[in-house]
Amino acid sequence: MCYILPCYVNYIQQFLTFGVKLTSFLPLFEPNASAEFLESRALAIRPDQWDLLGPGRKGTGLRIVLHQDGVHELRIEPFFNDLSQLYVELDVQHPQPFSGLEGVEAKMDAAYDYMFGKVKDFLASLK
């Protein structure tokens, strides 16, 4: 009798969802540069408007949700532990049930290609 998980994999009939999450850091090589980078290049909010929120703001980020082949959720924000870097996260969810693992590798490759293709081009366009 087998007591470990791999023995039970043969009994799984269907998976409910599949997701890929990629996280990367983009160094900007200057202290505190990440917040200024996003606020001055990606957002059209004036400093006096930010002041309406009160003191203590350390940075601002973007959250972009795209319904493409799966649901792409892209977060771009300062890495708050080191404000010289941007935190970039891509979470791609495929919320359709499926059986079998064929096609999973292609979805993983597509998420990687999106991150290092379209997301990279988007960030480069902000410079």
Region locations from a protein language model:
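Aromatic- and glycine-enriched beta-alpha-beta binding-site module
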Residues: M1-L22
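Short secondary-structure junctions and interdomain/linker hinges
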Residues: C7-Y11, A44-D48, F122, L126
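Aromatic/basic-lined ligand-recognition segments
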Residues: F18-Q85
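Low-complexity, flexible helical/coil segments
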Residues: P55-K58, L123-K127
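Mixed-charge, glycine-accented linear interaction segment located at domain edges/termini
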Residues: H67-L126
